[in-house]
Amino acid sequence: MSYVKDIICWKSGASVTDGTPAICEPGDFPEVHYDLSRLAKEFDRDKLSHGPSSLWRYLPLLPVDDPDNAATLGEGWTPIVQTPALGKALGSPQLVIKDEGRNPSGTFKDRGACVAATRLRELGIKTIVHNSSGNAGGAWGMYAKRAGLNCVNLLPNDVLPASLCQSVYSGADTILLDGEWKHSGPMVAEAVQKMGWFNVGTFKEPHRLEGKKTMGLEIAEQLGWTLPDVIVYPTGGGLGAVAIYKAFRELMTLGWLPKGPLPKLIVTQYAGCAPVVKAFEAGVDHADLWEDLDVPPGGLKSTRPPGDQALLKIIKETNGAAISVTTEDAIAATTQAIDLEGLFPCPEVGTSIEGLRKALAQGMVTSDEKALIMSTGSGLKSVPVFPTPKFRTVEAGGSLSP
């Protein structure tokens, strides 16, 4: 049984028919609304502890009719890891990290792909298409296969090997774009019109957001139905961060979280693709096209983030910020996390580690605030981006002594 009430465009309020191309204008997006009053009467949050250790424990807050339809690989319920050594180094002693690298494909993208693929199968969709800088391509290839959907992935020609293999070996029709990435969106839109495929790109349909919303649901439950003071999130299209805050608002409406201020949102981007940061610093409510893309292979390639307006609104409402970080500083921060904590996040997360350092130095965040960094993916997805490690060699039979 689903508690979905309707799907409407976030900004305009226009109604959207499930399973059809969204009619929302640029800067707007389709959003699922639930009958939270009925849900609050019929479902108690204590029942969640009896559910599976996956995102499917939150079925009442997901847009799926039948849990038996779930195209699951065991995604979600990723740990929140205490990081005292890194926190001390940054000046944030209560710092914790939610490790999304534990998901099946190695990133948080599995959440959106899982829930959306499940719902699209229920709706009878046959072929999906989207443009991805890599991680979502791997996730969609895997979950489309799980759901029995045909998948067309448009990826950049510098896509990292792990994501490429996940896409190709799962049977997705994988196409590499030889040219500027800003052309990928229009190319997908043209294919949708010509072929009738269903576009599952960022904010193009409502169900990916609902899957990623489970990150916020987990944060609240894993922290004992409280919230951190600050959330630091590496941001490309903006879907993940927007989804987390949708979760918090729904939990407050249900009475599962006490009503109060939402966590301060700090979004971070590479300096070579920072349209949200540029908009934040200019004090405007939307991001313009970023022309000169200069980032390493992997995520955070969104030159015109479709969630820009929602993201900037959350930043403003929570007294947050948007911070850019050089590629070099991001990679250095990532290797610092490996050295101090034994965690192996992707370089995108390094923008958030270094971004938190900057936020603390500039007084945007204080040392007594509890900060949570969203580690959106595993460093295993991004090995070629890291510098060649230094190590010793020894001949067979030789000594291991220094």
Describe these PLM feature segments.
Residues 1-402:
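PLP-dependent amino-acid enzyme catalytic core
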